[in-house]
A protein has these predicted regions:
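Sequence/structural signature of beta-propeller modules
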Residues: 1-140
């Protein structure tokens, strides 16, 4: 099973500045650390991949998780994580760190619901966030 991370922002002006390098880094990291569970294989099949779509909405107090949506032709199981967004807040390191923490925590919640092991991820949460924020190539300049 591979894990893929992408972003979709349907609401104009409501988005986080993470780019394709961020998506690739997180996809590679999750694919290396997460193994399919028997529950996932029983529900969808061992050949299915897991997709996380990051998005944002104004007016949310906490993340909103939608899914799963199953794409049988592509053999994908997709979840969308809508993060809280506030246009009045600067996209500084604190804001981005909070968004990443909420995103990763939501992903871990989904993985745990699917009986996938997340101990390595949970233990490395701060280091993963620091790695992303420390690499300017993963964040588009405003």
């Amino acid at each position: 099973m591979s894990v893929h991370v992408s972003q979709i922002y349907p609401e104009a002006g409501v988005s986080y500045p993470f780019n394709h390098r961020f998506q690739k880094y997180l996809s590679d990291l999750l694919s290396a650390k997460v193994r399919t569970s028997q529950k996932f294989a029983d529900l969808y099949g061992p050949e299915y991949d897991l997709i996380f779509r990051m998005s944002a909405k104004e007016g949310l107090a906490r993340p909103e998780i939608k899914g799963p949506t199953v794409f049988k032709r592509d053999k994908d199981v997709e979840y969308t994580v809508f993060l809280p967004f506030d246009r009045s807040v600067d996209m500084d390191a604190n804001t981005l760190s909070r968004a990443l923490d909420l995103l990763l925590s939501s992903m871990i919640e989904i993985l745990e619901e699917l009986d996938m092991t997340t101990t390595g991820l949970s233990a490395e949460l701060s280091a993963i966030i620091d790695r992303i924020l420390g690499d300017a190539k993963m964040i588009d300049a405003s």
